Curated annotation (Swiss-Prot):
Protein name per Swiss-Prot or TrEMBL: Uncharacterized protein AF_1382
SUPFAM superfamilies: Winged helix' DNA-binding domain
Matching InterPro entries: WH-like_DNA-bd_sf (IPR036388), WH_DNA-bd_sf (IPR036390)
Signal peptide location: none
Length: 95
């Protein structure tokens, strides 16, 4: 199980999905599956599959508001996203 969670973080789309949730939450925005799907240019079904895996890894929580699921990072997910952001910053500043 641990191995699968680590592999999940190194998939490009999964990383893009996680960081989309992170950046949107920084702006105080609620994040929905359909929004993520359009932002990362992936099918709704694929985004939902990745979100479920993030949920199993306790990186996100899904909250139902009416018929819409809102996706939020857990503390663990927030810490992981912040570390990834630090790596991105290092790579972007390495010129």
């Amino acid at each position: 199980m641990e191995d699968e969670r680590i592999k999940l973080l190194f998939k490009e789309k999964a990383l893009e999905i996680l960081m989309t949730i992170y950046y949107e939450s920084l702006g105080g925005n609620d994040v929905y599956i359909q929004y993520i799907a359009s932002k990362v240019n992936s099918p709704h079904s694929y985004v939902w599959l990745i979100i479920k895996k993030f949920e199993e890894a306790k990186m996100v929580e899904c909250e139902l508001e009416g018929r819409t699921k809102i996706i939020r990072l857990t503390d663990k997910g927030q810490k992981i996203a912040q570390q990834i952001k630090s790596i991105i910053d290092i790579m972007e500043n390495d010129t």
